[in-house]
Amino acid sequence: MVNVPKTRKTYCKGKACRKHTQHKVTQYKAGKASLFAQGKRRYDRKQSGFGGQTKQIFRKKAKTTKKVVLRLECLSCKTKAQLPLKRCKHFELGGEKKQKGQALQF
């Protein structure tokens, strides 16, 4: 279980700052895939018409988790940076801090 606070003071690479400032932390999420990317256009063109499936569909998935990527936004200059974490099954953003002698809850 990884619990990350919603704000963190860390170095900002923005041209305005270049020092340690307060950052807002959010979890990175992949955007919607574009229909007009070259690979997608090529794939759709190849798939159209007769002949069934033309490229392999990947089925041998090996990983059970994804790496968590944090998106840090500087509160003074709005510069955004990304910070990858290690793999984890449970990720929490701004959850309650652990108390001593308490049982784990999911």
UniProtKB/Swiss-Prot annotation:
Please state what the protein is called: Large ribosomal subunit protein eL42
Q: Which domain of life is it from?
A: Eukaryota
- Protein's organism: Eremothecium gossypii (strain ATCC 10895 / CBS 109.51 / FGSC 9923 / NRRL Y-1056)
InterPro entries assigned: Ribosomal_eL44, Ribosomal_LSU_eL42, Ribosomal_zn-bd
Q: Which GO terms describe its cellular component?
A: cytosolic large ribosomal subunit
Entry keywords, A to Z: Ribonucleoprotein, Ribosomal protein
Q: What family name appears in the similarity comment?
A: Belongs to the eukaryotic ribosomal protein eL42 family.
Q: Which PROSITE patterns match?
A: RIBOSOMAL_L44E
- Could you cite one Gene Ontology molecular function of this protein? structural constituent of ribosome
Query: One GO BP annotation here?
Result: translation
